[in-house]
Amino acid sequence: MLSDTICAIASGQINQAISIIRISGPNAFKIMEKIFLGKVGRSMEITFGWIHDDNQKIDQVLVLWFAGNKNFVGEDTVEINAHGGVLNTNLILELILKTKLARLANPGEFSLRAFLNGKIDLVKAQAINDLIHAEVKVQHQAALNQFLGKSSNFIKNLIEKIEEIIGIIEVNIDYPEYDDVEILTSDVLLPRINQLLADFDQLIKIANNSRLIYQGIKTCLVGAPNSGKSSLLNILINENKAIISEIPGTTRDVVEGNFVLDGLLFKLFDTAGIRKTTEKIEQIGIEKSYESIKKADLILHIIDASEKNRQNLDLKAKTRPDQIYLKIYNKSDLLENQEEFKDEILISAKYQKIENLLEKIKSIFAFLGKNKEFVANSFQISQIELGKLAILDAKTSLESGFGPEIAIVDLRIAWKELKTIFGRVDDENLLDSIFSKFCLGK
């Protein structure tokens, strides 16, 4: 994989002031000798000159050459800074490919090479991708913490604890006569296994909060028809996306939109009004409403406060313990007396008076902003959970009467699952899957 030369537009396919075309691999310098009028300077120096095709000038550019190990990728790399028109940039890329000394890079292949060349570990590689795709400040900070290695320390501490136990067991097995190492019997080992499980549980609990940061907080707006769900969605996303009508059952499909509150990304789903109906299309919409409730992190149950005979929808009974459920009483502008709702969240979507709702949501999710150190993406959370399962298997072995020499097999599996987070990956297909989600030219 590392023996050939790759190239790509690193700055995206858009019109811009300056575009960057990146070439990396053993033929990078040879390619520049063919297409650059002038001499490429020494490593880390910028050279000014023309890109040409058989002496036909294409563009006047700045060329920066990074020798060998003195760059992000870890191999000879050239970056061409050209005028940023899409056509102009692609003409230069086509010219590079025309030399037949390089091929077009796959998405994320520069980062993959940096990983394979030992310039970054897998955590940093994924952090770069997360940094690029960050939509809000909290996501940006989480990705930056990953890149700086702050999150890695939590996992590395677990790895070290497992390594220590494995090391002692191996000495007990291979050198039973060695007196300077404690003897780990099943009775001595079991409390340590339980402590490891507690450490895993704590890490998983914190890591699961990361999903809300990286993927956004899935927020479902539900309630009876004409309760004001669509009006509230339009206010939150600052766009007339959902149809507002006096006719019940207007919203028949799930309408989506995003909004940012206190630096956090909320992904909104406005659902069909829930009521008893014989109308088949409306019934399908209501079924989709219940599906959205199942997927939500935050459920906002919108109720028309002005209705004297309000439909009693027991939606809270359909929620899980890990979901947050809020009752929101709308249409405060139609109330003569608001005393009945003094302890409730009362809003007026019509007049955009929703401050108390926003403050309530901010207070609920304030803890996400406080976790400055440890965050994990879905791949890392999956590996931590696999590690915990292996530790549970070790505990089961010990409780079933097997000795440490059997439990060590599961301890090694747990160790491997955690090491995979940093790049101890034996499956090349897994690597391809991870890096294929990266941007072209990265």
UniProtKB/Swiss-Prot annotation:
It is found in: Cytoplasm. One of its GO terms (molecular function) is GTP binding. SUPFAM superfamilies: Folate-binding domain (SSF103025), P-loop containing nucleoside triphosphate hydrolases (SSF52540), TrmE connector domain (SSF116878). Mg(2+) binds at residues 230, 251. GO terms for biological process: tRNA methylation; tRNA wobble uridine modification. It is an enzyme of class 3 (hydrolase). Residues 216-366 form the TrmE-type G domain. The keyword Metal-binding applies. Keywords: Cytoplasm, GTP-binding, Hydrolase, Magnesium, Metal-binding, Nucleotide-binding, Potassium, tRNA processing. GTP binds at residues 226-231, 245-251, 270-273. Coiled coil: none annotated. Its EC number is 3.6.-.-. It holds the Pfam family MnmE_helical. K(+) binds at residues 226, 245, 247, 250. GO terms for cellular component: cytosol. (6S)-5-formyl-5,6,7,8-tetrahydrofolate binds at residues 22, 79, 119, 442. Binds 1 potassium ion per subunit. Gene3D superfamilies: P-loop containing nucleotide triphosphate hydrolases, Probable tRNA modification gtpase trme, domain 1, tRNA modification GTPase MnmE domain 2. Belongs to the TRAFAC class TrmE-Era-EngA-EngB-Septin-like GTPase superfamily. TrmE GTPase family. Exhibits a very high intrinsic GTPase hydrolysis rate. Involved in the addition of a carboxymethylaminomethyl (cmnm) group at the wobble position (U34) of certain tRNAs, forming tRNA-cmnm(5)s(2)U34. Homodimer. Heterotetramer of two MnmE and two MnmG subunits. This is tRNA modification GTPase MnmE. It comes from Mesomycoplasma hyopneumoniae (strain J / ATCC 25934 / NCTC 10110). The gene is mnmE.
